[in-house]
Regions:
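Post-nucleotide-binding-loop coupling segment downstream of the phosphate-binding loop, primarily
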Residues: 9-12, 17-27, 31-126
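Alpha-helical sensor/transducer elements of the RecA-like P-loop NTPase core
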Residues: 15, 46-47, 75-79, 119, ...
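Hydrophobic, repeat-rich solenoid/adaptor surfaces of innate immune receptors and signaling proteins
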Residues: 15-18, 22, 35-36, 49-52, ...
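Conserved catalytic network of the ASCE P-loop NTPase/AAA+ motor domain
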Residues: 28, 104-108, 144-151, 257
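Short catalytic/ligand-binding loop motif for oxyanion handling, primarily in non-cytosolic enzymes
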Residues: 43, 72-73, 121-124, 162-166, ...
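A eukaryote-biased feature capturing mid-to-C-terminal, repeat/solenoid-rich segments of large proteins
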Residues: 229-243, 321-326
Length: 326
């Protein structure tokens, strides 16, 4: 195992349905490539750590690496081959063979490879999932992982995923995407309980306002604690607080947006209710094809939500956009 880059689990709040889904995909359906995506702070990495702790004994090799700062594909493959070939040589020290191609190791051994910060491979200032110059060969590598027969699994974690990874799942392919959403109210209440805020009046309103996002709730709960119980004032109206840690988290993700995405987000942020796609398309400043591409990209980033042909965004994102995109 190489789990030296895997974070400590820390506090973990109930994600039983997501854990069950991932476990089924990996151990029963033998999926080869799984994308774990969601907005910053939602708990993707924490969920993956819990998953690894639960299923690591089912694999010969378990590897957790961060792709920050962006190793080239050659560097990444060489490092992975070196790790797996050293393990092989320890098992049979008399052999003095050259390392095999990576796919051969994935076929020979059951490996779980977790790659965090997958968004580090993608360009800033572009629509979601466009590889940076010099990193486009990752596209064909992940396609190989998906299509060639082997007994290993790659779990990709990030705010963005490659454009080639479908957002809808088919039982006929060995590739899956799981978009992580907020905690349900009982699980999110555990966060407030950690901050001695679980019994405040209208705690569910606070959870819903911050959409069950663990990081958002933790930063707001910390602020409430430090201001000695300002929760009553906060809950009196629809105030959305943006503590510095929360703003920094959003900045890291939203600073990567293309200009067209920023325009579309600003349009959505000005509306107090969900906007119909047809109404957005009436905007004469944005060509329809550009607008539709931006909506798709923002949805893939989990920055907007779509219900039928209506679009909206989390209240926290709206507050950030209205205070930042001027």
């Amino acid at each position: 195992q190489d789990l030296s880059e895997m974070p400590d689990l820390g506090a973990f709040y109930d994600r039983t349905p997501e854990l069950d889904t991932l476990t089924t995909w990996i151990l029963q359906q033998h999926c080869r490539l799984i994308a774990l995506t969601g907005i910053s702070g939602i708990g993707k990495t924490t969920l993956a750590v819990q998953l690894v702790q639960q299923i690591k004994d089912e694999f010969e090799y378990v590897i957790w690496w961060s792709l920050y700062p962006s190793p080239t594909l050659t560097e990444f493959q060489d490092k992975l081959i070196q790790f797996l070939s050293q393990s092989d040589n320890l098992d049979s020290p008399a052999t003095n063979q050259k390392p095999l191609p990576l796919i051969k190791y994935l076929q020979k051994h059951r490996c779980l490879v977790v790659l965090d910060d997958i968004h580090s491979l993608f360009s800033s200032g572009e629509l979601a999932g466009k590889y940076k110059p010099g990193y486009e060969n990752y596209r064909s590598f992940f396609k190989q992982v998906e299509q060639l027969s082997h007994q290993s699994c790659f779990l990709l974690i990030g705010w963005e995923q490659s454009r080639e990874i479908p957002q809808t799942n088919s039982q006929n392919t060995p590739i899956r995407t799981l978009k992580i959403t907020g905690l349900d109210i009982p699980a999110a209440q555990e966060i407030l309980r950690d901050y001695e805020l679980a019994e405040i009046e209208n705690y569910s309103a606070l959870i819903l306002r911050y959409q069950g996002n663990p990081l958002w709730l933790q930063t707001v709960a910390t602020l409430i604690q430090e201001l000695a119980g300002c929760e009553h004032e906060i809950l009196l109206d629809d105030t959305i607080l943006l503590p510095e840690r929360l703003k920094n988290s959003l900045h890291q993700q939203l600073s990567r947006l293309s200009e067209i995405e920023k325009q579309v987000l600003s349009l959505l942020a000005q509306a107090s209710e969900p906007i119909k796609r047809a109404k957005l398309l009436q905007n004469t400043l944005i060509p329809p094809s550009d607008l539709l591409n931006a909506l798709q990209s923002l949805s893939r980033r989990s920055l907007i939500e779509q219900q039928a042909d209506f679009y909206t965004m989390p209240l926290v994102v709206r507050q950030y956009v209205n205070s930042t995109f001027t």
